Amino acid sequence: MRDCAGKLLARGEPFDVVIANAGVMATPFGHTADGFETQFGTNHLGHFVLVNRIVSLIREGGRLINLSSLGHRYSNVDLDDPNFEWVPYDPWIAYGRSKTANILFAVAFDRRHRDQGVRAAAVHPGVIQAELARHVDASQIQKLIEQRNQQLTA
């Protein structure tokens, strides 16, 4: 992301909209090249670094859109243990942490930049068939649907 941001800054072309959409879901335990848990690093920290480095390129009236997920309901962000060093790794908790971080980032970004005419939002894109779910099998998805239905009818 740092290299990408550097190239964008060197070009100097402004943006009307930045959509932070890179992501992974329910991955096996692993780390990014920078040593962060894969989902938190990919889904949140990558966006955070890129956007904060190129914020000067977002025009007045521009927008930042963070693709989050209803999966944010699985977990709050745990900044005391973002890499699962003290608790067992759970891919859905990790996903939830990253998606909660997307939302919190959008809220904080909006607060910091709205007076300059730049706004931010986090959105749930809906359920779609995509490579995002490549680490999830059908039984896991069915279990999630059943859990959600139980919550909605309780």
PLM region descriptions:
Residues M1-V136:
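Rossmann-fold NAD(P)H-dependent dehydrogenase/reductase core
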Residues E37, D90, Q142, Q151-A154:
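Secondary-structure junction/capping motif
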Residues E85-W86, S139-Q151:
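A short C-terminal helix-loop "cap" of Rossmann-like NAD(P)-dependent dehydrogenase/epimerase domains
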Residues S98, A122, I145-A154:
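C-terminal helical subdomain
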